[in-house]
């Protein structure tokens, strides 16, 4: 949706656009750009014209705007005096008259007291602590009951319709808990019984039950379906809340489209309407635009009360201001009330709000109008420094290190949170608040909940569709919700068609491979095993394709939960829609796979049999989809669901009835096949294939010429003496105990499974859709808990955090410790005419344009710019961290070009705080120091320096805390301090780069970080730091500024000057407006540059290029180069020999340190190691006792080989366990450690491969014990047992190296998984178990020889059964009568001499019993498996392991290290 080519007649381009030169008191309409204003007018005009069309419900005249007021020309989109704001108000008024208005949002809370569960202290679990847990059972029981921690203490307040409340407080003050509580998000929280909380008189309990969606909590994370476009996302939201009576009698579809168009215009999204929303993996709109989509979606929810928890994080001040102004617009036009927590609120943002509340460690210390808050605290005795914003001042009051008392008031002002609360409750402002609350309660009495909700209910019922339940909180009826969700599901499929088609192509490839393995199976007894194998593969591959649905359902669960909380739909209706939309996709998959498979394998060429086969395949596909969807719905996380699915898959495959036929099943597990849907499908498909058919026998016993009478028998099961044909029904009865009469019974059973699992899935989706929240806590290593957190030690702590933020704030340096132990800085880094070009969609785009500058030791340089100007891009280019594009220009150190050591000698503090989750703070710092400081520095000195950094950053209290994850580990500020600390621990010799070090921090934490950077610079460090929009005070800490406009164009580089005077003089003297005394220079500058031209119409970039300041920069760069070239020789002489090397430490030291760290990581991840062990033990025991005491009959030998086949089936889950962990390690290495030249990629890869091996050896031992002794027993000698143990260990080692080979070059585990499945299934299919090598088509024989499982199965099988005597079962014997006057032995002597085997009753003259084998080796020889090859096979697997390691190394180097543009990444 672009801007119309021409305006409606009489319109002015500048209507309703307020001058941007006013720093304060902006209109809420400011957030609507000029282009979007025109767009809104076009929508209004089109709507007016739509109402004038013949046949429309209302036919007003051309000048009849939405509110039917003929006289008001400001409401006519075609009028010169058209007012956008008035038109929107009129539209809301018109909507109100038609039942479209939202209920007014008002809330009152009195004595609101909230407690949280969870310990303030957690200990890091390790493999050791988990294994020794039984020994600590009594201690665990004693500490099981944890007293609830009080988070909020007696809050009082009221918000009326159309009000905005700003919630201020430092991290841990209770802001999030407060917002969650007032919105009913109380999972893991407990509200005291004495607390009063109601919405216009309606209790929270009734609100959550009947009017969910009227009160909404918005987290800072944007959750959307990535493949939907912006318009589709917003039209869905509008359709879900479309009322029964619609604006100007539109249809539902018209209203949804119209409402989406309006909000896209209001929030500046019209240009993105056809762009995917996207996410971290799917390309879509920008992060800021995605945030606006979230805001627009919530606006369409038409909720009267909303809470926003730090939703502006990551936005610059200008974008954050637009966000808040959007809320202002929503409040003004729709009467909504919004509570917003913002960490860094500029003055402009602050002034948009009506009320503000200040929280201090769980206590409310102010609640009232924004205009009186500053005066209140100044009257209390606190001083607000000049140019500090009101928001920063109010937050600073809660930090003892930041607040300043007025002279003479130091002993009078409150000190503790409790003191502040007492002062507040005694103040006249509090009494005014109580009066306001009393007045609100008079208007909305709380005594009669039913009466208070009557108005809400009436409005809701007026909006609800015809068939909706009156008590339902949803506007749409359930059938309409299903219809809407189904439409969206098809949109998602269509927008991601490549994924669907790749799945179809994958199924076709698998069908071609599998079908060709069993190609043209003969319609004789020789085809019995091939046909059975074909149908077994067919039913399994149809059934197990649905397993991937678990991950897709988990990826969408947060979105469904969010939209259910907005009262868009029942989660169950989304689940139903997902199943419905899957029908055509699954049908396409079934056709693609089954048609190819069926005809390639030469299954029964009869129409009825083909359609029965297809019906069973399609049905079992849906049944298993329901099973896996149910698993996803009843579990709490994807790991649980996948673990459960892995165990279930093993049970389903074993008890399908093929690898372990029903007669061979043991009573303790036999019951499983009755609960196995695949069993019923397989029986039906086998019976369907073999019923009513007679198969020619191709092998007779004995195979003499001129056989007649009953003197011979077919060698196949189900044969009858003297018959040359074998009945298919007889064969399946003897081999499987299957019968054709069960076919339609089994179909009925499958339908019952389908209905049952679908019902559980829909129910679980509805009831298990909420996630619980836990209190935040620090995690420490056992034995390293700091003294202040041990029981009995008293120290003020924040109830919401494990440690208060003030406890871990980097304190101001004491007078005795002002000098930092930094290396002396002598080098100056300069860059000249840097440009950077990349190619986007085939077109070149310039991101940086002739940027020049320098960073000198002892200076703090700020890098700023408008949103999208290329700040981070410039930092990446200067730090040599770009991997694509063309860079032109020059970079120098002391006037000389950069060498290989440049990246090692610079520190780069990235915006993302990436650290190893299992390491402690001290370990993270030591790792950096050990590898990045020169080899000439001893390990002791490196450790001592780390302690200095810990003290420098004030991290002593949590130095032994584990990094962890947000919520269980370091908080945002602590992570940021650690990120800075890691770079300082490396002792950067040249300079320190920092990218947005204050992003996501509150203003006090930002101040602490910047003052620390100032301290670093004063100690001689060179610092270059990007920053969004600092406060005026914070801005003054910097020495120099490099400011970029859009396109990476320089508009200023130079000193800032006292009170920013040098900078302001430059802009004011070149045509910018005067900067107001009270204005923030940083905000002023953004505003001036955003205008793109000065008052003379000249572009600021051109102004800079023609300025004397620009010329001075070029001259200074040349002067630096000349001066430094003269002293370079002296400097180089003092450097040690390793100065110019790529890495600071030798390779073997790197490998040692990295390997130790990875070992530590594995030891501290008990869930990973225990899950590996559980898989090995549970799968080993299950297979072992399923194939327990394998007999040496023909069926017993076959089941023993199939037991090895099932052990091989563990390969895929083993590999899938390893890959995600490797991705985590690699992300940390490639994003932070490799660019810093901490250690080589070879050390990284080798360490990760090495550390897996000991655990894989352990898993092999566990599997050997659990599998071998139940199946084979302990009768074999230690040499045979030892070899089987070696094969088991080898299998696990091979799996780990195979995983590294597959994942090494792949971007993520999801991409690598299909490759793993394809390679694994190929290896398994061609290993000789399912189809002996002699039966394979000639083309595929090479795969039999290539498959590593061929040699592993052969080695295992022959070692287990070599030399064992075969004892045929009764149904395996060939029974026939010898000719007259001959015994069975005499009659069979000639045959046995050629074919082998044994006659069990040689002296009998009738009913000869012949067994085709004597020893097990003969059975294996038919598959080319020989005892003499066992050690060769063992050796060949090691060759495969070596090959895996080689390929992993090669592909990692080729695809992730080597640059293909001629340069190498080192």
UniProtKB/Swiss-Prot annotation:
This is ABC multidrug transporter atrA. Residues 135-386, 829-1071 form the ABC transporter domain. The lineage of its organism: Eukaryota, Fungi, Dikarya, Ascomycota, Pezizomycotina. SUPFAM superfamilies: P-loop containing nucleoside triphosphate hydrolases (SSF52540). Residues 1-30, 47-76, 441-469, 789-822 are annotated as: Disordered. One of its GO terms (molecular function) is ABC-type transporter activity. Induction: Expression is strongly increased by imazalil. Expression is also strongly increased in the presence of hygromycin and 4-nitroquinoline oxide (4-NQO). Curiously, expression is repressed in the presence of camptothecin, imazalil and itraconazole. It is a multi-pass membrane protein. It is found in: Cell membrane. The chain crosses the membrane at residues 499-519, 533-553, 583-603, 608-628, 642-662, 747-767, 1168-1188, 1195-1215, 1244-1264, 1283-1303, 1312-1332, 1434-1454. Belongs to the ABC transporter superfamily. ABCG family. PDR (TC 3.A.1.205) subfamily. Glycans are attached at residues 46, 111, 249, 310, 523, 735, 768, 1381. One of its GO terms (cellular component) is plasma membrane. The keyword Transport applies. Pleiotropic ABC efflux transporter involved in the basal level of drugs susceptibility, including antibiotics, azole fungicides and plant defense toxins. ATP binds at residues 865-872.
């Amino acid at each position: 949706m672009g801007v119309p080519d021409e305006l409606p007649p009489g319109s002015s381009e500048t209507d309703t656009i307020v001058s941007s030169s006013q720093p304060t008191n902006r209109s809420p309409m400011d957030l609507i750009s000029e282009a979007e204003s025109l767009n809104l007018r076009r929508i209004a005009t089109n709507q007016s014209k739509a109402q004038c069309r013949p046949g429309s419900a209302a036919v007003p005249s051309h000048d009849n705007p939405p509110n039917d007021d003929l006289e008001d020309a400001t409401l006519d989109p075609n009028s010169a005096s058209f007012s956008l704001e008035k038109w929107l108000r009129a539209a809301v008024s018109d909507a109100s008259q038609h039942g479209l208005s939202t209920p007014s949002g008002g809330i009152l809370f009195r004595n609101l007291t909230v407690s949280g569960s969870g310990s303030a202290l957690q200990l890091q679990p390790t493999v050791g602590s988990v294994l020794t847990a039984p020994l600590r059972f009594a201690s665990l029981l004693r500490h099981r009951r944890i007293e609830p921690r009080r988070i909020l203490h007696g809050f009082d307040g009221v918000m009326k319709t159309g009000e905005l409340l700003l919630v201020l407080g430092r991290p841990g003050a209770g802001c999030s808990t407060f917002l969650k509580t007032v919105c009913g998000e109380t999972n893991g929280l407990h509200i005291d019984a004495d607390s009063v909380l109601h919405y216009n008189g309606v209790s929270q309990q009734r609100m959550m039950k009947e009017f969910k969606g009227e009160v909404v909590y918005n987290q800072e994370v944007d959750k959307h379906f990535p493949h939907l476009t912006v318009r589709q996302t917003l039209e869905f939201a509008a359709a879900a809340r479309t009322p029964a009576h619609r604006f100007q009698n539109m249809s539902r579809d018209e209203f949804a489209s119209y409402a989406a168009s309006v909000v896209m215009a209001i929030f500046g999204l019209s240009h993105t309407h056809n762009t995917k929303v996207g996410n971290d993996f799917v390309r879509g709109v920008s992060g800021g635009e995605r945030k606006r989509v979230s805001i627009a979606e919530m606006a369409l929810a038409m909720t009267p009360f909303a809470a926003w928890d730090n939703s502006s994080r990551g936005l610059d001040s200008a974008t954050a201001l637009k966000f808040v102004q959007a809320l202002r617009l929503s409040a003004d036009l729709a009467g909504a009330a919004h509570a917003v927590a913002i960490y860094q609120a500029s003055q402009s943002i602050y002034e948009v709000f009506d009320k503000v509340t200040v929280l201090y460690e769980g206590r409310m210390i102010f609640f009232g109008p924004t205009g009186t808050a500053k005066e209140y605290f100044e009257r209390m005795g606190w001083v607000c420094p000049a140019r500090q914003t009101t928001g920063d001042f109010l937050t600073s009051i809660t930090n003892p290190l930041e607040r300043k008392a007025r002279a003479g008031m130091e002993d009078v002002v409150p000190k503790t949170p409790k003191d502040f609360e007492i002062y507040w409750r005694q103040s006249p402002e509090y009494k005014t608040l109580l009066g306001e609350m009393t007045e609100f309660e008079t208007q909305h009495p709380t005594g009669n909940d039913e009466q208070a909700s009557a108005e809400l209910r009436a409005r809701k019922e007026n909006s609800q569709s015809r068939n909706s339940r009156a008590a339902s909180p949803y506007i749409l009826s359930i059938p309409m919700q299903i219809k809407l969700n189904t439409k969206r599901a098809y949109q998602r499929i269509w927008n991601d068609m490549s994924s669907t088609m790749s799945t179809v192509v994958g199924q076709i490839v698998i069908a071609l491979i599998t079908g060709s393995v069993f190609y043209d199976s003969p319609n004789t007894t020789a085809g019995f095993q091939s046909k059975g194998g074909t149908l077994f593969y067919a039913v399994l591959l149809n059934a197990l394709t649905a397993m991937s649905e678990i991950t897709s359902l988990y990826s969408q669960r947060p979105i469904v939960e969010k939209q259910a909380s907005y009262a868009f739909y029942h989660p169950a209706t989304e689940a139903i829609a997902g199943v419905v939309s899957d029908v055509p996709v699954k049908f396409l998959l079934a056709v693609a796979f089954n048609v190819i498979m069926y005809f390639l394998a030469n299954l029964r060429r009869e129409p009825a049999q083909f359609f029965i086969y297809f019906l069973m395949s399609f049905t079992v596909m849906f049944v298993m989809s329901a099973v896996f969807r149910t698993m996803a719905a009843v579990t709490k996380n994807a790991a649980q669901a996948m673990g459960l699915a892995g165990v279930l898959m093993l049970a389903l495959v074993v008890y399908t009835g093929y690898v372990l036929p029903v007669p061979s099943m043991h009573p303790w597990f036999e019951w499983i096949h009755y609960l196995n849907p695949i069993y019923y499908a397989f029986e039906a498909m086998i019976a369907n294939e073999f019923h009513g058919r007679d198969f020619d026998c191709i092998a007779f016993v004995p195979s003499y010429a001129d056989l007649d009478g009953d003197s011979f028998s077919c060698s196949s099961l189900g044969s009858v003496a003297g018959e040359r044909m074998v009945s298919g029904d007889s064969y399946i009865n003897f081999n499987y105990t299957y019968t054709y009469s069960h076919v339609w019974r089994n179909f009925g059973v499958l339908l019952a499974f389908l209905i049952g699992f679908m019902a559980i899935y829909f129910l679980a989706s509805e009831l298990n859709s909420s996630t619980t929240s836990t209190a935040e806590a620090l995690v420490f290593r056992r034995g390293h808990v700091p003294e202040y957190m041990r029981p009995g030690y008293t120290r003020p702590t924040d109830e919401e955090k494990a440690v208060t933020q003030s406890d871990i704030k980097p304190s101001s340096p004491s007078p005795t410790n002002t000098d930092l132990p930094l290396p002396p800085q002598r080098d100056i880094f300069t860059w000249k005419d840097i440009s950077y070009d990349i190619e986007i969609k085939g077109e070149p785009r310039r991101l940086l344009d002739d940027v020049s500058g320098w960073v000198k030791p002892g200076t703090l340089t700020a890098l700023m710019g408008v949103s999208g100007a290329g700040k981070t891009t410039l930092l990446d280019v200067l730090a040599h961290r770009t991997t694509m594009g063309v860079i032109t220009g020059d970079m120098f150190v002391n006037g000389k070009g950069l060498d290989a050591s440049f990246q090692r000698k610079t520190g780069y503090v990235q915006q993302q705080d990436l650290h190893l989750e299992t390491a402690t703070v001290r370990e993270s710092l030591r790792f950096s120091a050990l590898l990045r400081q020169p080899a000439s520095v001893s390990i002791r000195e490196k450790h001592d320096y780390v302690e200095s950094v810990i003290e420098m950053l004030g991290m002593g209290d949590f130095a032994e805390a584990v990094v962890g994850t947000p919520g269980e580990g370091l908080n945002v500020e602590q992570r940021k301090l650690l990120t800075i600390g890691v770079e300082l621990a490396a002792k950067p010799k040249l300079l320190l780069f920092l990218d947005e070090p204050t992003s996501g921090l509150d203003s006090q934490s930002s101040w602490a970080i910047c003052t620390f950077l100032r301290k670093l610079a004063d100690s001689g460090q060179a610092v270059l730091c990007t920053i969004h929009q600092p406060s005026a005070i914070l801005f003054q800490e910097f020495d120099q500024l490099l400011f970029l406009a859009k396109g990476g164009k320089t508009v200023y580089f130079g000193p800032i000057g006292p009170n920013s005077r040098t900078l302001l003089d430059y802009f004011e003297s070149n045509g910018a407006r005067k900067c107001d005394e009270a204005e923030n220079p940083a905000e002023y500058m953004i505003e001036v540059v955003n205008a793109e031209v000065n008052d003379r119409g000249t572009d600021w970039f051109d102004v800079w290029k023609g300025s004397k300041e620009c010329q001075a920069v070029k001259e200074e760069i040349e002067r630096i180069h000349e001066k430094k070239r003269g002293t370079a020789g002296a400097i180089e002489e003092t450097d040690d020999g390793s100065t110019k090397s790529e890495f600071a430490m030798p390779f073997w030291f790197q490998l040692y340190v990295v390997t130790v760290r990875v070992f530590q990581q594995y030891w501290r991840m008990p869930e990973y190691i225990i899950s590996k062990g559980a898989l090995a033990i549970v799968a080993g025991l299950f297979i072992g006792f399923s194939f327990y005491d394998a007999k040496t009959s023909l069926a017993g030998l076959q089941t023993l080989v199939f037991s090895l086949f099932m052990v091989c089936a563990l390969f895929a889950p083993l590999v899938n366990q390893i890959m995600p962990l490797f991705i985590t390690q690699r992300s940390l290495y490639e994003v932070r450690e490799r660019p810093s030249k901490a250690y080589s990629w070879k050390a990284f890869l080798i360490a990760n491969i090495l550390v897996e091996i000991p655990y894989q050896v352990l898993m092999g031992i566990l599997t050997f014990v659990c599998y071998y002794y139940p199946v084979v027993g302990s009768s074999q000698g230690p040499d045979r047992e030892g070899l089987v143990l070696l094969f088991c260990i080898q299998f696990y080692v091979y799996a780990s190296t195979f995983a590294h080979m597959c994942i090494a070059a792949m971007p993520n585990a999801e991409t690598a998984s299909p490759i793993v499945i394809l390679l694994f299934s190929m290896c398994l299919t061609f290993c000789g178990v399912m189809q002996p090598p002699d039966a394979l088509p000639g083309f595929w024989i090479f795969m039999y020889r290539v498959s590593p499982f061929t040699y592993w199965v052969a080695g295992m099988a022959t070692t287990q059964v070599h030399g064992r005597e075969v004892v045929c079962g009764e149904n395996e014997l060939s029974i026939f009568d010898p000719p007259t006057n001959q015994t069975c032995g005499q009659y069979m002597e000639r045959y046995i001499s050629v074919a082998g085997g044994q006659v069990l009753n040689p002296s009998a003259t009738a009913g000869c019993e012949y067994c085709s084998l004597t020893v097990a080796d003969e059975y294996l020889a038919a598959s080319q498996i020989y005892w003499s090859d066992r050690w060769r096979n063992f050796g060949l697997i090691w060759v495969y392991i070596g090959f895996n390691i080689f390929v992993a190394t090669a592909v990692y180097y080729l695809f992730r290290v080597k640059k293909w543009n001629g340069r190498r990444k080192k």
